[in-house]
Swiss-Prot record:
Actins are highly conserved proteins that are involved in various types of cell motility and are ubiquitously expressed in all eukaryotic cells. GO terms for molecular function: ATP binding; hydrolase activity. It comes from Biomphalaria tenagophila. The keyword Transport does not apply. This is Actin, cytoplasmic. The modification N-acetylaspartate is found at D3. Keywords: Acetylation, ATP-binding, Cytoplasm, Cytoskeleton, Hydrolase, Methylation, Nucleotide-binding, Oxidation. It is an enzyme of class 3 (hydrolase). The modification Tele-methylhistidine is found at H74. Its EC number is 3.6.4.-. It is found in: Cytoplasm, Cytoskeleton. It holds the Pfam family Actin. The modification N-acetylcysteine is found at C2.
Amino acid sequence: MCDEDVAALVVDNGSGMCKAGFAGDDAPRAVFPSIVGRPRHQGVMVGMGQKDSYVGDEAQSKRGILTLKYPIEHGIVTNWDDMEKIWHHTFYNELRVAPEEHPVLLTEAPLNPKANREKMTQIMFETFNTPAMYVAIQAVLSLYASGRTTGIVLDSGDGVTHTVPIYEGYALPHAIMRLDLAGRDLTDYLMKILTERGYSFTTTAEREIVRDIKEKLCYVALDFEQEMQTASTSSSLEKSYELPDGQVITIGNERFRCPEAMFQPSFLGMEAAGIHETTYNSIMKCDVDIRKDLYANTVLSGGSTMFPGIADRMQKEITALAPPTMKIKIIAPPERKYSVWIGGSILASLSTFQQMWISKQEYDESGPSIVHRKCF
């Protein structure tokens, strides 16, 4: 990589977490919650020099006095003022760089509305004065990070899950499937089933505790019915968890009932197909000649694919759906929580990519619609 001072910035804006850093690095420098918090009551903290908004970890730690909002819902930006605050925080507080000195690579959800990519482009050039920028599709970056250009990516984060078939580096839009079931829904579901056990979690602060329980103790069962059987007859699957106040709670079949909702959305009262069936449906929407390449290169990406056991279960479920002789391979890279960011870091540091950037000059000549001609 050339000198740090001209390194491109890579910013992956997820519904739950924002990942940011420098192209050429192997991991993001900054990872913080995609939250903007505003004081619930004006002037509670007298003389504290109260700010009118807080971003990320600071918003998280002051959540008791704030109203927290997520500007990215289901992977798509819905509140641009708050989004701008997150980007500002990313550049100036987290990375401590001047955005007008660095090209910026942003990521977007598959099937992101055209107006949204234009708005991102406009904010980068007009608010932050970046010299150059690019918008890449998250799933495509994850595939690059796994060293492939053809495959199907199951990307599941905090706010949305997508299955994205990619051929020779291009996403196939007609076959992309979206499932509005992801980490946040699983956390909510775990809150609900723990309440049935007699533990009460209701506030946004308590939701964070439940998210931690989910991340530390949940796993995907290979055979759900059999696992339920085991859980009801022995205590071998029980684990204990200490709450911040010192109380210890025990969690049993909830450990695998929670992520099971990804395979059986009916648990959440949803009509949708599970992630295995959605992946299969995506593959079946593709040309018959490329299907075997997709089955053999099914890549998991995003934080909600981090549950132990998920790859084996996917293998089993897809095998049951696919033609009998088909070779099926589920790739679950250990760094998949950050593979979108890593793919962006790889892409932005390639010498061949340098002519792909949208420059400030091109933007000034063509306006925001330039993004559709240069980023696809």
